[in-house]
């Protein structure tokens, strides 16, 4: 099998987001940074929001039309301040990307899960998306073309362990659907992307495991951050103007075929 190619970081000549402002959480590196690159490459003004301000500033410095902002999605005041900053900086808010997440609870046995780690993962991943969406919604509605895109996971649809992370990502499915119904009359679309395994800094030191997983994917490779960025750009753009409340799998065909991911991930 010849592996498919990753989506390009930018597409020359395409400016779907000219005059748009986007706020991206967890945008200092990995998928969030790739989304920031893609949206600025298509003309957007972007707030690179992250709990790690130093990394956010470094990412924003690479981009035209981007600024960094500290944002802790587990804190309502921090979220509201980041949204207000985006509007003050650029005069409007058109796109919110809920990308921040936590994956600290990693007990192999469910009964060994820690209460604090469980609560942290759900608070950042699921409730964080709620906080950001709540704060951004009035501004997105005012833009007349608002879009919310959250980053879920195939873990939200099928058992790949990581109990708390999976529960939080599954919660994003229902949040997306219920919010889509509420936001549609206000002209705001709400969608979700479910990535498979993506080559991000979270895998540093485990590159060998990524190579073992590649053949499990029907398209012959693990994903790249740019693959997710391309999907987000589509869902946030006018090209998806009649799409809301949906989940877009960007998983190389994994869930369609389910070719023994967990067995390979466990090293069997």
List the predicted regions and their residue ranges.
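Short C-terminal tail/terminal secondary-structure segment
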Residues: 2-13, 107, 244-268
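Substrate-binding pocket helix/loop in short-chain dehydrogenase/reductase
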Residues: 106-110, 114-119, 213
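C-terminal substrate-recognition "lid" of short-chain dehydrogenase/reductases
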Residues: 133, 221-250, 255-256
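A short, exposed helix-loop element centered on a Lys and neighboring polar residues
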Residues: 133-134, 177
């Amino acid at each position: 099998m010849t592996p498919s190619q990753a989506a390009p970081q930018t597409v020359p000549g395409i400016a779907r987001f000219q005059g748009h402002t986007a706020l991206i959480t967890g945008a200092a590196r990995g998928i969030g940074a790739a989304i920031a690159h893609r949206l600025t490459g298509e003309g957007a003004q972007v707030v690179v929001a992250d709990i790690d301000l130093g990394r956010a500033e470094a990412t924003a410095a690479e981009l035209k039309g981007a600024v960094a902002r500290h944002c802790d999605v587990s804190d309502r005041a921090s979220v509201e301040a980041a949204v207000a900053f985006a509007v003050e900086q650029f005069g409007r808010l058109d796109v919110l990307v809920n990308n921040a997440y936590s994956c600290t609870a990693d007990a192999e046995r469910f009964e060994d899960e820690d209460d604090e780690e469980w609560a942290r993962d759900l608070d950042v991943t699921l409730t964080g998306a709620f906080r950001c969406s709540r704060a951004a919604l009035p501004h997105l509605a005012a833009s007349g073309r608002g879009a919310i895109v959250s980053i879920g996971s195939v873990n939200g649809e099928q058992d790949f362990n990581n109990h708390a992370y999976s529960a939080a990502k599954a919660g994003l499915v229902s949040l997306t659907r219920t919010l889509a119904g509420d936001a549609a009359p206000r002209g705001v679309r709400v969608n979700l992307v479910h990535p498979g395994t993506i080559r991000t800094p979270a895998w540093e030191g485990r590159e060998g495991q990524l190579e073992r997983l590649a053949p499990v994917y029907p398209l012959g490779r693990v994903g790249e951050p740019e693959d997710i960025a391309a999907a987000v750009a589509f869902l946030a753009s006018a090209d998806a103007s009649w799409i809301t409340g949906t989940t877009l799998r960007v998983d190389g065909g994994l869930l369609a075929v389910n070719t023994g991911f967990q067995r390979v991930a466990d090293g069997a």
